[in-house]
Amino acid sequence: MATVVNSQTLTERQKAPVEQEQSNACIGSAEREVLQPRVKGLAACACLMAQGDLTRLEPAVRTALDNGVTINELKEAFSQLYAYTGFPRSLNALGVLGKVLENKQTGWQEGKPWTRPAEWDDAKKAYELGKKNQTQLSGRPFNYDFCPQDDYYLKAHLFGDIFAGDQLSAADREIVTVAALSGLDGVAPQLAAHKQGAVNMGNSQQLVDELSAWLCNEGYTLRSKWAKGEPNPYGKYFIGQSYLANVGGGVINVTFEPRCRNNWHVHHKQVQVLICVAGRGWYQEWGKEAVEMTPGTVIAVPAEVKHWHGAAKDSWFQHLTYHKDVQEDASNEWLEAVTDETYDKLK
């Protein structure tokens, strides 16, 4: 039987940064509105900026600019998001944009020139604009009497001063906000509110649903410090798409897209160790109940035990893996696929 241990008991070789458990709302996209490349570009940049993932943000910025997002729109998006992610991540993202622009491509557009909003010079006007925008976004008047300071900041500054800028429409601003919040832990109430707010500000419900699915299915909401790697060369033994990244020392990081799982298999004359580092997945031995894997879960798979592991239906999944107690003539034996009937019993 597999041994499941807490991450605090790892040896030095096994220790690795793990991410908090996340709930990725990956949903199907059949018969849904097609996301335009410009919307995808804004959303990808916002999601990665919110996570502080500057490595992935740089190519995302290039792709966004290639697909019609203007330079000034990205400046506005990264500036707006300081209200949700803080100045450090806002400034870091702007720094990435500046770095990318050092090698500016011919087709990239500046966009409309920036102009100073009149509301910045009239506090009352900014407050009234913010009150109007907040009411539309919330679907009703909103007054946060519990904390008048936050109530004022939200109305006068976020929905007033910031929304007064003309680089992005209100609908675009909510797309950016939903994407950013999708990349953060612990903000489920705000994310839900802004998904509805995105509709109230002019986006269709279908577009918002498709945006959420796309961010998850493309892996933007996989909050992980571990590289996804390249398509798995052993993909014929998997259902769905997976990726491998060699992290050194005999340790491999395996990334599974939602619903992806490997076939039943057996490790002969060796023990396999699995360490979940991001997302949510499953491990199951033949004839046993499946074990849920979340960041910090460690499983030692005994030799000669038939088993499989893979992602949950609604989440990406990453685990590190290596072998120990390896004997002479150790090998892996790949067996039949895990059927949908077996997999779909899991929640």
What residue ranges belong to the model's regions?
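Acidic, glycine/proline-rich low-complexity segments that act as flexible tails and inter-domain linkers
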Residues: 2-39, 50-66, 89-170, 192, ...
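A short, N-terminal "cap"/entry segment at the start of jelly-roll beta-barrel domains
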Residues: 222-250, 263, 332-347
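Acidic/histidine-enriched, glycine/proline-rich intrinsically disordered or flexible terminal extensions
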Residues: 118-134, 328-347
